[in-house]
Amino acid sequence: MADQARAQIGVTGLAVMGRNVARNLARNGFTVAVHNRSPERTRSLVAEHGDEGTFVPGETMADFVASLERPRAVIVMVKAGAPTDAVIDELVPLLDEGDIIVDCGNAHFADTRRREESLRAQGLHFSGTGVSGGEEGALRGPSIMPGGSAESYAKLGPMFEKIAAQVDGVPCCMHVGPDGAGHFVKMVHNGIEYADMQLIAEAYDLLRAGLDATPAEIAEIFREWNNGELESFLIEITADVLAHTDAATGRSFVDIVQDRAEQKGTGRWTVQSALDLGIPITGIAEATFARSLSGHVDQREAARRTFPDAGEKWQVSDRDKFVEDVRRALLASKIVAYAQGFDHIRAGSQEYNWDIDLGGTATIWRGGCIIRARFLNRIREAYDEQPDLPTLLVAPYFAEAVSAGVPSWRRVVADATRAGVPTPAFSSSLAYFDALRAERLPAALIQGLRDNFGAHTYQRVDREGSFHTTWAADRTESPA
């Protein structure tokens, strides 16, 4: 119902996500002020869902802000970038010291840091808050990753923890850290999501090529996998999508969808950030590039015509063994993707002084979000037991799972390579694993080459300091 009472929190921007967050808050007993640039959406929300709780509609931004109790908390749910800045600029003159602006959109964490600094100087709190779970999650319980000050979380926390997904009685929400921490963690979440989906797609492609199976038959394999270590939301819906039949043609749904995967940019942001921090997130990077490559249709067609028979004929002799090999390779590659993602979060936390709880991050990803999976409990346990874990791969559970999967992993990548089936995420994850465990890498040669053409110096294994060799002259070595 509509009410003239003071609202505990407000939502401006009532497209699907904003509308569902407002409804979720109202359903959980909070009085919610609602506003949209076009008042028709505000009226529509109250008319259609007013019986779910108490809404206070605001025709104008001034009316909307005036209806909020102090300190005011305003959730902004508009497109990232300039539209978000425009709404903030409209809000600021209407707010008072101590009020809170919450950006629940997919903002770049650097923009969030800029906005937080600017608004803090004006006496306002700014919480960049990641929300994962899509439309259904926003309504029924998402994973929520709030950043910003501890003071802002004191106001927001009780509300966000109430509307978030719950797993084992624990809300999938925690105060991630100051300024851009919440949006940074959400960005990395999305990067892991890219890798997870690419790995699943490659597993499907391998099963289809190796078994000559139909999508419906492969759906049953994924359903079986979802009963074990791979249990996750994405594996569950993969089975649903593969089993779906197109009503218009009677064909498998995946066979009538164009094979061009789109992206909104968070995968690219994740890769760019990792490059800035010097963190090798190879699986996430390959997943992002795979989407880019899928869109280069003209190049793909030209290559297909030029190299029609570049792969060997593939014939699987033992179906069950092959399916198990793909399952183990998928699990090992997935572990690598999560390990890289958590390495990235730790590096960002150190660089920006955020002090992010890695075990806590795994905890709030267990429900509501797109990458929710059974083994997030294991990730939480690993970081709770050893917060300074050098890499998730060496935690006992994950080390055992990866070790058990290595022979299958190698067979799958080798078979795919011979058959000409592209597995960029599987292959790069295996290469990352091998590079990480290698006693010595060929990077020594690279350093020698850099010193040869650019006098970039090198360090020796037998003494301290940097050195340079005069390659063009007498090749003597001297301290740099």
Regions from the PLM with identified roles:
Residues 9, 84-88, 102, 107-219, ...:
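Rossmann-fold dinucleotide-binding core
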Residues 403, 408-480:
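C-terminal amphipathic alpha-helical interaction region
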Residues 1-66, 70-72, 98, 134-138:
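NAD(P)+-binding Rossmann beta1-loop-alpha1 motif at the extreme N-terminus of oxidoreductases
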Residues 56-63, 80-88:
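Glycine-rich, highly charged phosphate/nucleotide-binding loops
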Residues 183, 208, 213, 220, ...:
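Interdomain hinge/lid region at the active-site interface
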Residues 349-383:
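Small-residue-rich helix-loop
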